[in-house]
């Protein structure tokens, strides 16, 4: 796992969107599997990357159809298995129409946390080799955070994982943590090393711990 952290507005989400191919770089290059992203068809990039953000868009269609967008050929059983793995199956089944519930424009009939879990289910169904999580637990309440973290762990087994996190406690075990400041890489290392060598990261960690203590 590679984690991107930094102050608000430092450029973390911009990096994630560049990696996902949403924008083109104006200098330098981004490679995926040894190939420059700018030379790859958008359809191929989309097949290789699952992008789960804090603002996941859902279409005004059924929950089943929204999850199935991850892999249009998936069976109903596969859709429901992905929902179970992401921790939203029980929630869906409590709805009057279950998986056939229409979510409303942009998923407006669901809470932010419910939309995120459906987006994670869609990513699980897609099973792409590269997973980008852009503050994917931003709307998850503390009671369900452990469940969603377990779902994310299942989603990312054997995959290249890039995480942008606002809760630093979720990325302390990352193989590499990249501290982004003012659009540049300020420092990068493990959690323990950054606590020793990077004042900015240390301040962010102390602020995070202080906020948790006040909850």
Which stretches of residues belong to each language-model region?
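ABC-type nucleotide-binding domain
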Residues: 1-215
């Amino acid at each position: 796992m590679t984690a991107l952290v930094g102050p608000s507005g430092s450029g973390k989400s911009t990096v994630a969107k560049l990696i996902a191919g949403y924008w083109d770089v104006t200098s330098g290059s981004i490679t995926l599997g040894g190939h420059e992203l700018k030379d790859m068809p958008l359809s191929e990039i989309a097949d290789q990357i699952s992008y789960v953000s804090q603002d996941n868009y859902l279409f005004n269609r059924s929950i089943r159809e929204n999850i199935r967008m991850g892999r249009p050929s998936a069976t109903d059983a596969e859709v429901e298995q992905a929902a179970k793995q992401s921790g939203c199956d029980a929630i869906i089944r409590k709805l009057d129409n279950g998986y056939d519930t229409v979510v409303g424009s942009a998923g407006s009939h669901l809470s932010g946390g419910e939309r995120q879990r459906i987006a994670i289910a869609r990513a699980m169904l897609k099973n792409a080799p590269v997973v980008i999580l852009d503050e994917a637990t931003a709307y998850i309440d503390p009671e369900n955070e452990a469940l969603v973290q377990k779902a994310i762990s299942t989603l990312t087994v054997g995959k290249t994982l890039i995480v942008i996190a606002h809760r630093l406690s979720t990325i302390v075990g990352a193989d590499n943590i990249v501290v982004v400041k003012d659009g540049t890489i300020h420092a990068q290392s493990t959690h323990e090393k950054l606590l020793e060598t990077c004042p900015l990261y240390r301040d962010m960690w102390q602020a995070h711990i202080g906020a948790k203590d006040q909850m």
